[in-house]
Amino acid sequence: MTNPVYRSARAAESIAAQYRRVLERWPVARTELHVPTRQGSTFVIACGPETAPPVVLLHGSQANSAAWMPDVPLWSRKFRLFAVDMIGEPGLSAPVRPDLAGDAHALWLDDVLVGLGLSHAAFVGTSLGGW
């Protein structure tokens, strides 16, 4: 297995299964999306009023969108949240890890925004997601 995120297919499957169990406890109603990008599929959790201002949430390294669960109940009252599983991290997005020194992540994020139909949005990021 050549996967820059996990040491084995078994580890990848185990983490994905545990993550799905955690997502079952997402604190508000949600929609799970799979957005095609040039880096592969990107997993996004959308929640909050569909007509509310959009906010894109980008977690840090060695994390996934579950990191936002404590914040979601409050923020989703006034905003349409899009919690994006960053590529190359232990979530449900493509297990690719492009070089951080290039423009691959910026182009990937452009693809995500286009796939979500967002021409503008506010961003909240932590660690790696804060660029």
Q: What kind of feature is each model-predicted range?
A:
Residues M1-P54, K78-F79, L118-S119:
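Alpha/beta-hydrolase fold catalytic core
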Residues I15, F43-G91:
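Conserved HGGG/HGGXW glycine-rich cap/lid loop of the alpha/beta-hydrolase fold
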Residues A17-R21, A67-P70, A104-D111, W131:
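Alpha-helical elements of Rossmann-like donor-binding domains used by nucleotide-donor carbohydrate transfer enzymes
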Residues R30, G40-T42, S65, L81-V84, ...:
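Generic alpha-helical hydrophobic packing signal
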Residues L33, L57, A94, P98:
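Generic anion/oxyanion-binding catalytic loop in active/binding sites
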Residues R38-G40, S61-N64, L128-G130:
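Short beta->alpha connector loops
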Residues A83-L128:
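Active-site loop/oxyanion-hole signature of alpha/beta-hydrolase fold enzymes
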